[in-house]
Amino acid sequence: YEEFIFDPTAFYLTKYLPRVLGIFDGMEELPYLPGLHYFRLVGGMRAFAKPRVRAALEKIMKAAEEVERFANVHVEFTNRMTAQGFPTSHISTSVAPYDLIADYFRGATGTMKDLYRNKDELLEMLDKATVFLTKQTIAWSRASGHPVVFFPVHWAPDRFMSQKQFETFWWPSFRKLMINLIDAGIIPMPLWEADCTKRLETIRDIPPGKCIYWFERTDMVKAF
């Protein structure tokens, strides 16, 4: 928590990405860039000549070229389908801040323990995650030219945490993210997976007509 909260970018480049993506192996040898200054800026560039860092950068560029080719095929397909009268419901996707942490950093067991053992750190990380998720989601949506952003909701269902915990840890950051997107002219479209009936009263606190709610399984009478 401490490293991520202090400098998420450094944590991503030197810790997280080398662990989850093989092409980033070697990036942990990068210097702590914000500490470079004056002649240290020049000297610090030596790190990019290290064999493992050079190999990582070459792999990253090669992978990026493949992703670019895939993206171009996807854009061409989407445009062709739209021209034939089948526009996509959405192009961009994003994730709730709590789900980002639970799915990709701490895991189910770790995050559930954090609800009791690391409350302050979890809340601070949620605040930080909300900021960069807002920026990245707006950028993705505008680049796609489609105003709807899809959110698969993983950790909001009734069985995963108490209502008090939901209102403390899960909902505030997601609501803030959705409001930020709405203010930017974007339409959030979360899919509330599993049963979220107990959450209905809370999640109604959003500007009417500004988002689309999907429900996998809930009391639709109460939902309406």
Each language-model region and where it sits:
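Catalytic cores of TIM-barrel enzymes
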Residues: Y1-F224
